[in-house]
Amino acid sequence: MMTLRSRTLLASLIAASFALGGCGDNQFEQEVKLEQSAVQLAQETQQGGYQLLTVAELKTRMDKGEELVIIDTMPYEDSYKKEHIPGAKNFAFVKEAKAGDNWSEIVEGSGTPEQFQALLGEDKSRPVVIYCGFVKCGRSHNAAAWAVTQGYQQVYRVPGGIFAWKGAGYPVSAE
């Protein structure tokens, strides 16, 4: 299995490549944007204390029947209700937050820390997988970092989120 640093670098490069879709034709500008995305993802991962998974790794774990808690951090009506990774539970977080923000500043809506912990479960050694829409969306970072602060030991973020999941041709569920 890859080291956390290797996994972070690999995921950063993969994730950043998804971000290039909207970049200009100038290869130098594209490289600057790729670098910014890669560094931001690496910094968030390091600051949050969680690990990264690709959608392919998540799908493999799901296919093997591994017991995972999968959390979709996108808004219920606009996203989760329409499509989500099969088996995922929903708890919406905000896109942007700062270190030290309190709970009400990182959660979208009226969800409480107790409700989020109830979704994650009492077993803090069980793998928790958190995703949002795409690499630049910070919702999954906010949720993963919070789960780590609550003592969950195997917290994973899928940076490509539902866009990468669909891009890989994997099935989605809807409410």
Q: Which residues are covered by each model-predicted region?
A:
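Short, solvent-exposed loop/turn and secondary-structure capping segments
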Residues: 81-83, 141-143, 168-169
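Bacterial N-terminal signal peptides that target proteins for export
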Residues: 2-10
